[in-house]
Amino acid sequence: MKNILISGSLAYDSIMVFQDYFKNHILPDQIHKLSVSFFVPELKRNFGGTAGNIAYNLSLLNSNSILMATVGEDFSSYEKRLSKLDIVQDYVKEVTDSLTAQAYITTDLDDNQITAFHPGAMMESHQNSISSVTEKVDLAIIAPAGKEGMIKHAHECSEKNIPFIFDPGQGLPMFDKNELNTFIDQATFIAVNDYEAELLMKVSELSISKIQSKVEALIITKGAQGSEIYCDKKITIPSIKADSPVDPTG
């Protein structure tokens, strides 16, 4: 079975439900001095982060995942969860005097969201090195983490001829034109959603066809409209109809 190295974040997601509408508590003409507090009787703490989410889904497919991430001193409960899933954590590094990345997400009855994100130890992702991995790596995934770490790990994959998927996600705005063009030149595959694809084209100043010509495949997800894969041809993948769609946040 092939080994997939996942460089990204591990995070706690605290999901809160506000049993009302934000619009009833925010006065538009007083927005310049906003001070609000929401009573949230429902709270769930989930295990998340880009690397954690990818590793979990690969475990459902019986794939071998190797996690590479930086975490804080509060990681113990997440560590136990990953151990139960038999996910390799040899390259999960604890950063002293730091907390694991965490998001605090409040959702109202209209599914509007207010989110606060603390990156914590995630910003130290450059402390890890792909050169330290002793296992054979068949494919790597560079997912959102600290900017310096993402650049470093993509460079290491390129130097070691490890094929990798560049999955910038919400980290895309961190990079300028030159940095994104370097990622595109180094990557084997690129995976983005439709909004990120537009942003990638704008900042890199490259068209979809030009980006695709530099990689083996460009994957664009489009939510309910399915996905598109651009390789030597365009492949359209329809979405699966859900009986009861749920909010995937966290």
Q: Where are the language model's segments positioned?
A:
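Hydrophobic anchor at the start of a short beta-strand
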Residues: 4, 63-66, 89, 164, ...
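Conserved phosphate-binding/catalytic region of the ribokinase-like
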Residues: 4, 205-250
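A short, aliphatic-rich alpha-helical micro-motif
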Residues: 134-135, 184, 212
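A glycine-rich beta-to-alpha transition motif near the start of alpha/beta enzyme domains, typified by
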Residues: 40, 64-91
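Glycine-rich phosphate/adenosyl-contacting loop at the front of the ribokinase-like
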Residues: 1-66, 77, 238, 242-245
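Beta-strand->loop->alpha-helix junctions that form or flank phosphate-binding loops
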Residues: 68-73, 90-100, 216-222, 241
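Conserved phosphate-binding/catalytic loop of the ribokinase/pfkB sugar-kinase fold
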Residues: 90-95, 103-144, 148
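Conserved beta-alpha-beta core of the PfkB/ribokinase-like small-molecule kinase fold
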Residues: 139-208, 226-227
